[in-house]
Regions:
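Conserved catalytic or regulatory cores that recognize and/or transform ribose-phosphate-containing ligands
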Residues: 1-119, 124-287
Length: 287
């Protein structure tokens, strides 16, 4: 593929040049009806897989929320762990901070000590409070606990939208993480929150907005997908070469591209086989 990229006249060479031209002239257009990114936090089962509640929420979104991409931090972290050159500098908290900035909404299922920690971390940021959708046990609605008087009160004061707090009678204990309970009770109000599309005006993006070495946002993520769709399947080193062709050699792309690939894998619009990344979405985000 690298040979095709550098060889004049090949399809990959033409596609890369076309990308570079449009990006260089600030002519990349983003439509207004793009999907939301929903960051889903909560517990894991003993085998490391997402809790039964999180699996049910993902299944619900895939069937009924076609305007949303749900994703988990663990899948992004897994992709970053492939970087043998710099894996020691990665930690889940820093990755979660980046993902929370990227997300349109953050759903936290309060089902474990780790999820309470995530609530405290996200609620500390005034910028993130308005994004939070908290799923909690009905029995704790009126309890004078640190959670209610601290992070939940802070979120309420910030957003003044009680619809961001969803309650039902949750099963308790470790079995509740391993097996499904009645979380379907909150599906209707969750649908009401997430199905609303705040349709944005179509935008024309600048080159600096798309450079993955300086950005980790929905636009840069969508752009990397479109490169993979146009030029793929691609190996990581080939994607790096294309990024250098479009944006220049002055940046370090490997780690940042792995983070972009991680979120694309997590929202299931690309996949990877034998180290080749390819699109499952089959349509371009940008025009």
């Amino acid at each position: 593929m690298l040979t095709q990229l550098k060889k004049v006249g090949t399809e990959v060479h033409r596609a890369t040049n076309l990308f570079a031209t449009y990006v260089g002239k600030n002519k990349v257009k983003c439509p207004g009806d793009v999907k939301k990114f929903i960051f889903l936090c909560g517990a894991n089962k003993n085998n490391g897989e997402p809790s039964a509640r999180r699996i049910e929420l993902i299944d619900f979104s895939e069937k009924h929320l076609s305007n949303c991409h749900f994703f988990l931090a663990e899948l992004v972290f897994k992709e970053l762990s492939k970087d043998e050159e710099d894996s020691s500098s990665d930690n889940l908290l820093d990755i979660e901070a980046d993902l929370s900035k990227l997300a349109d909404h953050i759903i936290i299922v309060l089902e474990s000590f780790s999820s309470f920690t995530e609530l405290g971390a996200f609620a500390y940021s005034k910028q993130l409070r308005k994004k939070l959708i908290i799923i909690n046990n009905t029995k704790f609605i009126n309890e004078k606990s640190f959670i209610n008087m601290g992070p939940i009160k802070a979120i309420t004061q910030q957003s003044q939208q009680s619809g961001y707090f969803l309650h039902y009678k949750m099963a308790e204990g470790n079995e509740s993480i391993e097996r499904s309970d009645g979380i379907g009770q909150i599906f209707n109000p969750l649908y009401d929150i997430l199905s609303r599309n705040d349709r944005a005006i179509a935008r024309t993006l600048k080159k600096e907005d798309l450079d993955p070495s300086n950005n980790f946002n929905k636009d840069s993520v969508r752009f990397i997908h479109d490169i993979i769709l146009a030029c793929g399947p691609l190996k990581l080193n080939e994607l790096i070469e294309i990024a250098i062709k479009i944006f220049g050699k002055d940046s370090f792309y490997r780690k940042e591209l792995l983070k972009h690939l991680g979120i694309l894998m997590a929202i299931k619009i690309i996949s990877c086989k034998d180290d080749f990344y390819y699109s499952l979405y089959k349509q371009y985000y940008f025009k």
